[in-house]
Amino acid sequence: MDRPSSRGALALGAGGLGKAPTGGAVQQPDRPMTGQRGAAPAGPMRAPAGASIIGAGPPGTAMRGGPGPAGGPPGTAYKRMGTASQRPGTGQQAAAAAAAARAGQQLQVENRPITNHGVSGMKTAAAGVGRQVLDKNYFMNELRQKRMEIAQVTSNMKSDLEALERKQAQYNSMDKRASDLSKEVKILQEALADYNTVLDKVGSQAPVYVIQQEFAALKDRNEQQRKRVDEVLTERLNLESKAKQAESKMSEIQASMDQRLNSMPPSQRNEYTTLVAEQQQLQADSKRFEEVLDELDKALQASEGELARNPFKQRSLQLQEQIRALTEKKYELTEEERQSKRSPEELRADLMAKIKRDNTEVEQMTQQIRELQDQIKKMEERVKSLGGATSGAAAAEEKANREKFEELLAKERDLNNFMDGFPSRKAAKMQEKQQKEDGIVGVLEKMVKMQGIIGSNLPSQKKYKEMQDELEYKKMQLENTQTTQERLKEELTMRRTELEKIDTLEDKIKLELTQLAERQEAMEKEMGEFGSVEDIQRKANAARERMEGLRSVLLKRKDLLRSIVAERGLKFQAKRAQLQDHNLQVQLEKMEAKLKNLSAGVFEMDEFIKAKESETNYRQLASNIAALVDDLNVHVKKAVV
């Protein structure tokens, strides 16, 4: 692999020397003599007149690439250098300064290099730079280093994970121990409560039967609570089972609905999806409206509570409601008075207009009802069509069979009805036939009698037609007269009813006027009472003074009660201090501590006894020995036999 040239090679190139080819002898290049320095032609090695070599930049390519005098191939110094060779170091500047000194040029102090520690002399060529080409070994070393770092981090993470697992195991064991200890503490607290209860009973010298009664009462109460808990648990299990059954039914219904939905045509499915989305939107709106309504209810309750706490606001609200009611009554009375001053013709016209309006409203409502019924029928037909469309060919066949079966049932029903009613209908028809025959015979007899009476005075055919036409005309006139008479009767009845209404309306108006006059007088009296604001203010002031007096009395009682409570508290503290100083109290505390120690000792002895019993448990061994003896006896008996 080719390596870039070092700084020494660059210095030689700057001084006019080049590196010889690899494997050959270094030949001295042409260099100017001392006397030829001033007259040397301008070339790549010649600096401009008046220019400083030290202040010049790095050497150009003309100083690098020329072949040697022998014409051999260029050395490795003429190869492509790395990025570090683009900026020459201070060593190259020192070589350039040496060349300038040999050329006899004057050094410029202001262009001297500045080192790390200030202005100093020029340094010689420093050591070369590091690696310039990143080859395979470099990357392999980097990969090894990264792999070692990853392995180190992995091992650290594994150790941390193991530490966390150990801590988790310790935490689980400690948690289990804490739960066991909490249970044990709870049991001990219950035992301590029982001991304290017994100690209280012993200290109060309660008889044994009282303790037994309390024990029985507590036992009964615990049994009742246990039964109640069992009932609640049973009810909960029943409810959970019912809920599961309901959920299973809902899932089945949902599955059937999904199946029917999948069997629907795309248009109906899209319509169903649209309706479902609309339903969800309506449910969301309903929920939002319910929330708003709840907020309004809460605000209303808060306002009502505030109003209930403030008696002045309550009184003000009552007065405002009374004023509003009186104002409405005043308007009503004014309107009724105005109506009472009107003539009967105007009242009748208003009544007729009101009747017309009512009739119009009734017709509109009837029309709306018809439209709604039509819409309901359309929606029912649509639902039927949707239900029929989802069932497919099987549903159509089933529907056709059902229709045929219904037709057969209807025909059979009609046939049975006909057979059941045939005798009665036959008798009726025979009776009707007999009556018609008797009528025909009677008519023939009358005709024979009339022919015998009239003889040859029978009218001609033309005269008979005229008489028949005249008879029809008379019948028509009679019908018209009867129709006119009926219409006149109806109109007469309507007029009589209107007259009765008018008569009753006059009486009613008079009665209402009398009542309104009485109500007006009563309202005027009430308005006079409410109109005196001074009386109301005087009553309110009197009530306020009475309340203030009651408040002062209550405050005095409050202070008195506080003083009594403070005095009783001091007495209680004195009694407690006296009790603490009493010898019996000290002895009782000592006995309580001794009882606790004895209880602890008893508990430890019980544990010790249980442990020893478990260690010296011989029953299992005895049972095993007995079983072995039985087996041996059986084998001995078999051997003897």
Curated annotation (Swiss-Prot):
Q: Where is this region: Disordered?
A: 1-99
Q: Which cysteines are joined by disulfide bonds?
A: none
Q: Which InterPro entries match?
A: IFT74 (IPR029602)
Q: Looking at the record, which segments are called Basic region?
A: 1-132
Query: Can you tell me which residues the record assigns to a coiled coil?
Result: 139-633
* Keyword DNA damage (UniProt): no
Which UniProt keywords are present, listed alphabetically? Cell projection, Cilium, Cilium biogenesis/degradation, Coiled coil
- Location within or outside the cell: Cell projection, Cilium
Q: Which GO terms describe its molecular function?
A: beta-tubulin binding
Q: Does the keyword Acyltransferase apply?
A: no
Cellular component GO terms held in the UniProt record: intraciliary transport particle B; motile cilium
GO BP terms: cilium assembly; intraciliary transport involved in cilium assembly
According to the UniProt entry, which residue ranges have a biased composition of type Low complexity? 37-62
- Sum up the protein's function in the record's words: Component of the intraflagellar transport (IFT) complex B: together with IFT81, forms a tubulin-binding module that specifically mediates transport of tubulin within the cilium. Binds beta-tubulin via its basic region. Required for ciliogenesis.
Q: How does it assemble?
A: Component of the IFT complex B, the core composed of IFT25, IFT27, IFT46, IFT52, IFT74, IFT81 and IFT88 as well as associated subunits IFT20, IFT57, IFT80 and IFT172. Interacts with IFT81; the interaction is direct: within the IFT complex B, IFT74 and IFT81 mediate the transport of tubulin within the cilium. Interacts (via basic region) with beta-tubulin (via acidic region); interaction is direct.
Q: Which family does the similarity line name?
A: Belongs to the IFT74 family.
UniProt name for this protein: Intraflagellar transport protein 74
Specify the species.
Answer: Chlamydomonas reinhardtii (Chlamydomonas smithii)
Q: What is the lineage of its organism?
A: Eukaryota, Viridiplantae, Chlorophyta, core chlorophytes, Chlorophyceae
